[in-house]
Amino acid sequence: MNCYLILTVALLLTSAMTGTTTAGQLNKKGVTLREDDRFPCNPGGCACRPLDSYSYTCQSPSSSTANCEGNECVSEADW
């Protein structure tokens, strides 16, 4: 039983020491990113985080932002 405890503690410490997270990084607009800070859309597009999702969708800057969090579609320049 002590082996399981030691293994669990070792895994937790390894995770804490590497500083890996699944979320929590912020870009300059304060948008929480899922995995890394790369812009998720093609050049000329913008990233919309739908109100009912944690994943970004790409759309044209001229598209409606009514379903985007904060009513905003973030361009690559503002990412």
From Swiss-Prot:
Secretion signal span: 1-23
Gene Ontology MF term list: toxin activity
Protein origin, superkingdom: Eukaryota
Organs and tissues of expression: Expressed by the venom duct.
Disulfide bonding pattern of the chain: C41-C58, C46-C68, C48-C73
Any Gene Ontology CC annotation: extracellular region
Propeptide: 24-37
Subcellular location: Secreted
The entry's keywords: Disulfide bond, Neurotoxin, Secreted, Signal, Toxin
Comment block on domains: The cysteine framework is IX (C-C-C-C-C-C).
Name assigned to this protein: Conotoxin Cl9.4
UniProt source species: Californiconus californicus (California cone)
